Amino acid sequence: HNNPYVTEFNRVVTEDYSLIKPDYTFHDLVSEVTGFTNMHTTQPTYSYYDHTAWLNAHHDPRRWCAYIFYLNDTWLTQWGGQLCLLNQDEITIKDSIEPFGNRLVIMDVSDLTGTRINKHFISPVSITADHPRYSLAGWFYQTETDGPSPVRNENAN
């Protein structure tokens, strides 16, 4: 993509991004927030949800942490496109997160308890939306050689 926002976000995710702590990376931030210390990531994917577009309810297999950064300059609730997190019954909605611009969502999708958590979906974008829903999404995961689960720092926030 030639979008400067996408280019800058890719730099932030893969390189140093702090002027105060030049060695503090996005990976360090996610590790600090989630408590997972041995995760890996790839470059984020750019998503474009046009009118009536949506994403089925799903889990993120072999992934431990997911993040979404919203790129919308403006977004109204009635336009849809919310990230919806399901309860353990995987039917009722536990939480709905608006895709407001400059919002970063980091969510645990790990399997440390033996059951998948945070099954989620994207609600349909309304035909009344002024523009598509734009976001960058990525995952922290573990390779097969890393062992059965990520290491969680019990002192994490």
Q: What are these language model-derived features?
A:
Residues 48-56:
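Beta-rich nucleic-acid/ligand-interaction surfaces
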Residues 47, 60-63, 72-74, 78-157:
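Catalytic core of Fe(II)/2-oxoglutarate
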Residues 3, 39-43, 54, 105, ...:
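A structural signal for the main folded, soluble domain(s) of proteins
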Residues 21, 25, 41, 62, ...:
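Short, well-structured alpha-helical interface segments that form or flank functional binding sites
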Residues 32-38, 56-61, 75:
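Short, conserved, surface-exposed binding loops centered on an aromatic residue
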Residues 1-33:
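Non-heme Fe(II)/2-oxoglutarate
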Residues 34-45, 79:
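A short coil-to-beta-strand element that immediately follows conserved catalytic motifs
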